[in-house]
């Protein structure tokens, strides 16, 4: 550097002396660091030194202790010999401490406290909060699936009861005798609500071309007109009171 214009003429000599002294101290410090780095890569580490090289990895209080007072050290370094030798020969960096070593010692806290301490950052808190929302939604889905399953079970039970009721109605009608054979045939054709397919209705309604209502085209010759048949269970000829009486009778027989 050119120090010709550095300061005025009165203090120039003092400044030059100061700069030279600082430069000389800096060069000596660099030379000392080079020698120390070179000697740390040799197998004779620590023979010509008053302090051990391993103490650079220890706490500051142990670092100041001389070689002769090594017995005063409380605990030995947790690093094994192989890792310590690698650190001496290759100047490798120390591995990061385990997560539980941050803050207070792990022996004074439970695992739950350490987990809470790990998740104290805002990012991790948001992450775990979203995970809690996902878990709640999964529980709600399972709850809804349970409700659907229960409703399906109820529907299955009702279906089985309706099937039993229909079979009981058919059996009770068949026990009335041969005089109600036509009504028995009619009742077997009824399953559920009346539809066009069930009763074989014609396009013109109950009467078509001035002919009375018949069951279907294939039964015209076998069956007579409905108004000529004597039946006690024709739905279109029975009153609401008779239908309710039959239903009450069927339920009383089931119970």
Swiss-Prot record:
Modified positions (Phosphoserine) in chain numbering: 65
Biological process, per Gene Ontology: spindle pole body duplication
A GO molecular-function descriptor: structural constituent of cytoskeleton
Transmembrane helix is among the record's keywords: no
Region of interest: Disordered: 1-20, 31-123, 210-231
PTM characteristics: MPS1-mediated phosphorylation at Thr-240 is required for spindle pole body duplication.
Biased composition (Basic and acidic residues): 69-91, 211-231
Entry's transmembrane regions: none
Subunit (UniProt): Component of the SPC110 complex containing at least CMD1, SPC29, SPC42 and SCP110. Interacts with BBP1.
Purpose: Component of the spindle pole body (SPB) required for the proper execution of spindle pole body (SPB) duplication. Links the central plaque component SPC42 to the inner plaque component SPC110.
Family, per entry: Belongs to the SPC29 family.
Name by which UniProt lists this protein: Spindle pole component 29
Taxonomic source organism: Saccharomyces cerevisiae (strain AWRI796) (Baker's yeast)
Lineage summary: Eukaryota, Fungi, Dikarya, Ascomycota, Saccharomycotina
């Amino acid at each position: 550097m050119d120090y010709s214009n550095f300061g005025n003429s009165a203090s120039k000599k003092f400044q030059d002396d100061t700069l030279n002294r600082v430069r000389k101290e800096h060069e000596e410090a660099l030379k000392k660091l080079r020698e120390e780095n070179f000697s740390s890569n040799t197998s004779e580490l620590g023979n010509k030194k008053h302090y051990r090289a391993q103490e650079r990895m220890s706490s500051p209080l142990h670092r100041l202790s001389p070689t002769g007072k090594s017995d005063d050290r409380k605990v030995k370094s947790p690093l094994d010999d192989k890792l310590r030798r690698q650190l001496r020969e290759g100047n490798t960096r120390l591995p990061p401490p385990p997560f539980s070593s941050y803050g207070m010692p792990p022996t004074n806290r439970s695992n739950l406290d350490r987990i809470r301490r790990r998740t104290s950052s805002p990012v991790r808190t948001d992450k775990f909060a979203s995970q809690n929302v996902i878990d709640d939604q999964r529980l709600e889905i399972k709850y809804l699936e349970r409700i659907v399953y229960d409703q399906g079970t109820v529907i299955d039970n009702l279906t089985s009861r309706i099937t039993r009721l229909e079979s009981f109605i058919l059996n009770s009608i068949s026990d009335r005798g041969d005089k109600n054979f036509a009504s028995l045939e009619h009742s077997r054709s009824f399953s559920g609500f009346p539809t066009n397919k069930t009763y074989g209705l014609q396009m013109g309604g109950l009467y078509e071309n001035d002919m009375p209502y018949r069951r279907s085209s294939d039964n015209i010759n076998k069956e007579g007109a409905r108004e000529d048949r004597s039946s006690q269970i024709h739905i279109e000829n029975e009153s609401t009171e008779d239908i309710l009486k039959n239903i009450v009778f069927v339920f009383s027989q089931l119970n």
